[in-house]
């Protein structure tokens, strides 16, 4: 669904006002205005009988989602816990709180094309602004160019038994995540995994991905997708496996010849190498990359299929478990449209090694969504419900990624103090959510880091899995809400048993 020009201008002006205002109540009212402009036309209810306008309901559903609360009961408790603040934002409600049935109807009004289209539009504009402000939009420095990682994720709880006795595999969500900004720039949902390639193209059509480097798994490595990315003035760094058998076999053969010292692979300017080491938990990783010119490795027929591929990259990884001493070796193969130009890219091999790590940002995002937003456990049969729930979670993760990176960059801060579970719990207080959004849309975390994170002990005390103690210095007390919801869920389980 396309925005008309007037609505688009109104949204941009309103979000600018959110940034400039200092009172978070004014910010919330501005956000409510944005939602009213966009969603009121989709409200099917009788206007004469509406007590709770859709914009009021949607803004609370959005902020509740930022705190990880999705069910109608959770949203109601979130509203009740923040009623003092929301009464100031919505004075015409006179302190009334909608029933869970009203909240359910509001959630069903959020169709995927409406909510998804609007959030994608907002994130797309924000992404362009951030790239320009950080001076990475047109940079020629390879290490500073943004990496857009594309991947699909299965919602396993939606896996269903089919009439023929097979399993459906569950709904598949394809998303694009920016490494430099941490933003999710769009998502699509389907019932089959083989839709990923089409989804990547559809999601990227309306995005300005120029001067970025797009990456994806081997299952999506097809010449049509490479052609599309080139047409958008971007580059490709893609994994390749035996699904592209002829290309894969020629690359493997060329790499074996390189290791034996064969020509032309070993000539000056025809290869580049780099090595790095990484410590992660109890594992020690040693990674070595070899880059070769595509014209040296591939036959004319294969080059005709991949006319834009300039370089082949092979990464060998040796992983040692420091506890057991066991070493595991692996080899991965990549193709890229980036040319091995040592004048333009003096540290070409090391830059590609870094890109191969940056592409995992989408996997990290998926892990957080499963662990802290229960995306993998969401058993939605309806596509709209599944889409709306997950797109709010991805929007939240975009904001959280901004906060975590900003806080990690601060000097003399407690390591790991700003984590997803801590931010989720802090967002139980809607004023903190408003502060996060202000910082995110302004791409300026000074108020966030210096005012709230450093002043409150809630980010400094944690028990296992994010449960905090010593909350005496926190001005707004969100913890009774969390405890109440946990008790409510436990009671419902006991009643069901």
Model-derived features with residue positions:
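Structural motif
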Residues: 46-56, 165, 324-326, 379-389
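C-terminal structured domain segments
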Residues: 384, 388-410
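Short acidic (Asp/Glu) and glycine-rich catalytic loops that position anionic groups and cofactors
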Residues: 39, 231, 327-335, 368-376
């Amino acid at each position: 669904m396309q925005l008309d020009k007037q609505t688009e201008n109104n949204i941009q002006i309103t979000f600018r006002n959110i940034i400039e205002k200092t009172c978070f109540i004014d910010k919330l009212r501005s956000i409510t205005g944005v939602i009213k402009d966009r969603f009121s036309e989709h409200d099917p209810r009788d206007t004469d009988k509406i007590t709770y306008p859709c914009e009021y309901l949607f803004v609370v559903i959005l902020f509740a989602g930022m705190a990880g609360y999705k069910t109608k009961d959770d949203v109601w408790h979130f509203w009740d816990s923040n009623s003092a603040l929301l009464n100031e934002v919505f004075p015409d409600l006179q302190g009334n709180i909608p029933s869970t049935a009203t909240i359910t109807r509001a959630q069903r009004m959020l169709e995927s094309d409406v909510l998804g289209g609007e959030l994608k539009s907002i994130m797309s504009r924000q992404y362009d602004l951030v790239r320009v402000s950080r001076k990475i939009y047109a940079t020629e420095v390879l290490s500073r160019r943004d990496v857009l990682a594309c991947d699909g994720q299965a919602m396993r709880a939606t896996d269903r038994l089919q009439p023929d006795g097979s399993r459906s595999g569950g709904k598949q969500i394809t998303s694009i995540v920016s490494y430099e900004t941490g933003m999710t720039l769009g998502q699509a949902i389907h019932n089959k995994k083989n839709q990923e390639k089409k989804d990547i193209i559809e999601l990227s059509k309306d995005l300005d991905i120029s001067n970025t480097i797009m990456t994806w798994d081997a299952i999506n490595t097809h010449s049509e997708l490479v052609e599309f990315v080139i047409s958008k003035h971007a580059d490709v760094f893609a994994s390749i496996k035996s699904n592209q058998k002829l290309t894969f076999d020629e690359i493997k053969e060329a790499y074996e010849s390189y290791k034996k010292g064969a020509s032309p692979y070993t000539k000056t300017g025809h290869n580049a190498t780099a090595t790095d080491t990484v410590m992660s938990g109890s594992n020690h990783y040693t990674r070595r990359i070899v880059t070769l010119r595509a014209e040296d490795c591939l036959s004319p027929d294969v080059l005709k299929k991949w006319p834009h591929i300039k370089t082949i990259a092979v990464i060998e990884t040796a992983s040692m478990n420091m506890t057991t001493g066991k070493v595991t070796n692996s080899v991965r193969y990549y193709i890229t449209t980036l040319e091995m130009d040592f004048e333009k890219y003096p540290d070409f091999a090391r830059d590609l090694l870094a890109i191969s790590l940056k592409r995992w940002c989408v996997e990290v995002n998926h892990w957080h969504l499963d662990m802290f937003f229960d995306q993998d456990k969401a058993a939605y049969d309806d596509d709209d419900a599944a889409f709306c729930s997950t797109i709010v979670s991805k929007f939240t993760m975009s904001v959280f990624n901004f906060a975590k990176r900003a806080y990690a960059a601060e000097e003399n801060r407690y390591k790991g103090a700003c984590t997803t579970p801590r931010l989720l719990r802090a967002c139980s207080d809607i004023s903190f959510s408003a502060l996060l959004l202000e910082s995110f849309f302004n791409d300026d975390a000074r108020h966030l880091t210096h005012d709230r994170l450093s002043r409150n002990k809630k980010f400094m005390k944690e028990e296992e899995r994010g449960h905090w103690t010593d909350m005496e210095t926190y001005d707004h007390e969100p913890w009774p809400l969390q405890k109440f919801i946990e008790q409510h869920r436990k009671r419902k389980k006991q009643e069901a048993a």
